[in-house]
Curated annotation (Swiss-Prot):
Subunit structure: Heterodimer; disulfide-linked. The A chains have phospholipase A2 activity and the B chains show homology with the basic protease inhibitors.
Coiled-coil blocks: none
Signal peptide: 1-24
Keywords: Disulfide bond, Ion channel impairing toxin, Neurotoxin, Potassium channel impairing toxin, Presynaptic neurotoxin, Secreted, Signal, Toxin, Voltage-gated potassium channel impairing toxin
Pfam family, one: Kunitz_BPTI
Domain BPTI/Kunitz inhibitor: 31-81
Tissue-level expression: Expressed by the venom gland.
GO terms assigned for molecular function: potassium channel regulator activity; serine-type endopeptidase inhibitor activity; toxin activity
Disulfide pairings: 31-81, 40-64, 56-77
Domain of life from the UniProt record: Eukaryota
Function as written in the Swiss-Prot or TrEMBL entry: Beta-2-bungarotoxin is a presynaptic neurotoxin of the venom. The B chain is homologous to venom basic protease inhibitors but has no protease inhibitor activity and blocks voltage-gated potassium channels (Kv).
Family annotation (SMART domains): KU
Protein name: Kunitz-type serine protease inhibitor homolog beta-bungarotoxin B2 chain
Amino acid sequence: MSSGGLLLLLGLLTLCAELTPVSSRKRHPDCDKPPDTKICQTVVRAFYYKPSAKRCVQFRYGGCNGNGNHFKSDHLCRCECLEYR
């Protein structure tokens, strides 16, 4: 991995750590909503949290702004939706 890639990864991990309180935290309520797969604009790769699998899953997001359970990366999805104990 290039040094630029490592710096980006370090920055994302730092951001996730800063946004995650040290104490126990529950996931955002939008993380329990189903993915919005309607097509309104350009289709892009996105991730949503799948509660039954307890993980983030890739899907095709059509830009309809349906709910808050869509993220640009798996990392951002995990930061927002995984429970920390």
